[in-house]
A protein has these predicted regions:
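Conserved ABC ATPase signature
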Residues: 143-147, 151, 450-454, 458
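Conserved ABC ATPase "signature" C-loop
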Residues: 221-222, 530
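Helix-to-loop junction immediately C-terminal to a conserved catalytic motif
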Residues: 55, 367
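ABC ATPase C-loop
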Residues: 160-161, 468-469
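Conserved ABC ATPase "signature" region
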Residues: 121-139, 428-446
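Conserved ABC transporter NBD signature motif
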Residues: 63-75, 375-383, 392
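ABC ATPase nucleotide-binding domains
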Residues: 240-316, 548-587
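Catalytic Walker B motif of ABC-type/P-loop ATPase nucleotide-binding domains
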Residues: 168-171, 475-478
Length: 587
């Protein structure tokens, strides 16, 4: 897309004072007005730093060694004030809590307008407009710190968009949203583009950008390796895999099938593109060989391709009995309604549902941080609220959705070590445990850094390390993969699986990552408006699309594709989907 250049980087290299190694290296980039540019990168590749440069946060707020030029509508950004930046740019950061300042949602959203002296009548009009635009009509009087992570993210989006910036910079804006909520935000962003605004969106998952962005940039270790259209981007499969970027499931499946000899009519990257091509294939109008009369997926194939789930021991680790929780005034929301659940020792469970469905409230009740209005939680045969805080920490570990609430030591190493010393574990055992957990989570090289110098993704991994190092009976993680690229997300879930397998820990994750829930979890519990809607193995849960729609959750892409094609039971991953087609057609 050609036209007026909104932002430009010329030979930009940048390093922070705490690290001599440049985070960005000789970056050259032109962004045109009205363009939707997607920046794809793994955790720690410099994407948030790049966005901060484009927004003027660097060098006006964060200092460092900056070489080269950053131009906003042709003006060197070093010479511009932050106030002038604010007229043209609006930035949504990865952590919504870092952008919330006011008590009430309505005050938060109009705060920027108040600072600019916008008339009260105009503020009221714009407030109503953006509240409706971001599906926040009932949130005006809500308290910001009582919102779920996804709700906070939408409020921050609204507070930035209300000022009508010509350039919108988004750092993983859907990371804490349920799948349908994320899709709604993307559609809202596309509406923004109709007014000729520029959107620059950082993402570590290509799927979120395909079909929406008109240009994609691959950033790796501070350098731009690819800058092209979406179709050309995904065809660079070898390069993407080399730098650890996971291809979209639909594209991965289609590539495998073509390699096996299937004559797909197209190489789709999204579900919408895939359906026509795969319907032709299944109807016998394309493809190779003769369709077999066997079932879509044999028991043998299912066992060979399914995720290897160790399962539980049968001993009860956590029991939730007739649990009700009502938040006190002014919120006064009945967040949990007669919830009954049992978690066996060694179980790996996922709690899913739309933002505000009660997932985090349930997790905090299980951990003993919230006292139920009625009913209770039994951990190790005892009421969790009757256990003293030291024993509770040994029995139930909890990792918050915002990792910064759990980080307070001077270095990454000391942060993890403190947890062990607090429980009386010292000496060589403590040192070995710290090194093992940091190496496994790819944090050992950062052990000397202050936790607040880490990226959001690395902070999340550090918070998990601090709790997992204790090896509690039950480990609850609220959105363990927030801010993680797919490779690191997979590594975190693998670590949790390893902890479960080695020590019999019951693992409970709250997640919007359906692919991870499908591949790692023994059980999936879907909440809807504070009630348990579904509670079954992943394949059974994800096959019930109508009920899942009530929770604003969508199954993994290949599962959706199979269900649309009438394939039952549906596959949970690309390996299973590939096996289905190889069973249905003889080559």
């Amino acid at each position: 897309m050609e036209g007026k250049i909104a932002l430009e980087l010329r030979n930009v290299t940048f390093s922070y004072p705490s690290s001599p190694e440049p985070v960005l290296k000789n970056v050259n980039l032109k962004i045109h007005q009205g363009e939707f540019l997607g920046i794809v990168a793994r955790t720690g590749s410099g994407k948030s730093t790049l966005l901060s440069l484009l927004a003027g946060v660097i060098p006006h707020h964060f200092q460092g060694d900056l070489e080269g030029e950053v131009l906003l509508y042709g003006e060197e950004t070093r010479t511009l004030s932050l106030a002038k930046f604010g007229v043209h740019t609006g930035m949504v950061m990865q952590d919504p809590d870092s952008q919330l300042f006011n008590l009430l949602v309505k005050d938060e959203i109009v705060w920027g307008l108040e600072n600019r002296g916008v008339a009260r009548e105009e503020m009221a009009r714009r407030l109503d407009e953006v509240m409706h635009f971001f599906n926040l009509d009932d949130f005006k009087e809500r308290i910001t710190y009582d919102l779920s992570g996804g709700e906070k993210q939408r409020v921050v989006l609204a507070s930035v968009y209300i000022s009508k910036p010509s350039i919108l910079l988004l750092d993983n804006p859907t990371s804490q949203l349920d799948p349908l909520g994320a899709e709604y935000v993307i559609q809202s962003i596309k509406q923004v583009l109709e007014t000729d605004e520029t959107v620059i969106m950082v993402e570590d998952k290509i799927d979120e950008l395909l079909g929406h962005a008109n240009r994609l940039v691959l950033l790796h270790e501070g350098q731009i390796l690819l800058d092209c259209g979406p179709e050309e981007f995904v065809t660079n499969r070898e390069l993407l895999e080399l730098v650890g970027i996971t291809p979209p499931e639909i594209f991965d499946l289609s590539t495998r099938l073509r390699t096996s000899g299937f004559a797909l009519s197209a190489m789709p990257t999204t579900l919408e593109e895939a359906l026509p091509a795969y319907k032709l294939l299944l109807n016998g109008r394309a493809g190779v060989g003769v369709e077999r009369s066997s079932p879509p997926m044999s028991e043998r194939t299912m066992q060979a391709t399914s995720p290897r789930l160790a399962g539980s021991s049968g001993d009860l680790a956590v029991a939730v009995r007739d649990l009700n929780f009502v938040y006190p005034p002014p919120k006064q929301i009945h967040a949990l309604k007669n919830v009954n659940l049992e978690f066996e020792r060694g179980l790996f469970a996922a709690i899913i549902g739309q933002n505000g469905s009660g997932k985090t409230t349930l997790a905090r009740c299980i951990a003993g941080y919230l006292r139920p209005t009625s009913g209770g939680v039994i951990v190790g045969g005892r009421d969790v609220n009757a256990i003293d805080i030291y024993e509770r920490a040994r029995r139930v570990g909890y990792v918050f959705q915002n990792p910064e609430t759990q980080l307070f030591r001077g270095s990454v190493y000391d942060e993890v070590l403190f947890t062990l010393r607090y429980q009386g574990i010292k000496g060589q055992e403590a040192e070995e445990r710290v090194r093992h957990i940091l190496e496994f989570l790819d944090l050992w090289d950062l052990a000397h850094l202050h936790p607040f110098r880490l990226s959001v993704g690395n902070k999340q991994r550090l918070a998990i390390a601090c709790i997992a190092v204790l090896r509690p009976d039950a480990l609850i993680i609220d959105e363990p993969t927030t801010g993680q690229d797919p490779a690191h997300a997979w590594a975190i879930m693998t670590l949790l699986q390893e902890l479960r397998d080695q020590f019999g820990i019951t693992v409970i994750v709250i997640t919007h990552a359906m692919t991870l829930a499908a591949n790692f979890c023994d059980r999936v519990i879907a909440l809807c408006q504070g009630e348990v809607l579904l509670d079954a193995p992943p394949r059974e849960v994800f096959a019930q699309r109508e009920k899942l729609a009530e929770t604003f959750v969508k199954p993994p892409s290949v599962t959706q594709l199979a269900l649309e094609l009438g394939i039952h039971p549906p596959p949970l991953n690309v390996d299973e989907a590939e096996a289905i087609f190889k069973e249905r057609f003889q080559i």
